[in-house]
Amino acid sequence: MAQLTGKTIIITGSSRGVGADTAQILAAEGANIVVNYRSKAPRANKIVKAIEEAGGKAIAVQADVTNNDDLQNLVNTAVETFGSLDYLILNASGGMETGMGEDYAMRLNRDAQLNLARLAAEKMPEGARIVFVTSHQAHFIREVETMDEYRPVAESKRAGEDALIAEIPALSEKGISLVVVSADMIEGTVTATLLNRLHPGAIEQRRETAGKLYTVNEFAQEIAKMVTADVETG
């Protein structure tokens, strides 16, 4: 716990699902948590309340991660509120939404991730870390086929991972490390539920192939571990 006491962590897309569980896990370890949400303030405030009732510290900050002004405000608010920005967890993703434009997946999963990483790096101290959350379907998209509906997400998240890895030299100069965390289909997430609705039996098939699928909380535990894990950058 002492390792994270007083440290500040921004977690994008943390008003629900994996991000919300990660926020509560890290808050319990003493970190100051910035719960980021795009539009559902009550949901984000509920996570903040749960953290505070458990004795932790957190704030909710609205930011559409595809909007650079919102990203700058997110970073500034974290520093102004808690005095530092020590860790950034790039958890927010998407691309299966309708009516957002053909380039939305790439703007969200590649451009926004890199933009926020760069803005955060300007405020982060030596020893800080950025954690990028992805999926096996995205990480291995060049070797393994995925469902057509998920392909824009997978390809854009892989592009985001590549963009962040290319940023490692610049981050290393500042003493900031990058860690990529990946998992197979996560049971109970919006994406998994939607894909299973489009392809009945998809979750069961993935479970049989993989042997086991993480639950939301199990994957959140793994992400939380990577914040302070002694691993090489990249």
Predicted regions and their residues:
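Conserved glycine-rich cofactor-binding loop
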Residues: 8, 15-17
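Rossmann-fold scaffold of SDR-type NAD(P)-dependent oxidoreductases
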Residues: 12, 85-93, 109, 132
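Conserved glycine-rich Rossmann-like NAD(P)H-binding loop of the short-chain dehydrogenase/reductase
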Residues: 29-46
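The beta1-alpha1 cofactor-binding region of Rossmann-like NAD(H)/NADP(H)-dependent oxidoreductases
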Residues: 41-42, 62-74, 110
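Hydrophobic positions on the long internal alpha-helix
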Residues: 74, 89, 112, 116-120, ...
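Catalytic loop of short-chain dehydrogenase/reductase
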Residues: 93-99, 129-173, 185-189
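Catalytic Tyr-X3-Lys loop
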Residues: 99-121, 127, 131
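C-terminal helical subdomain
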Residues: 174-182, 196-234
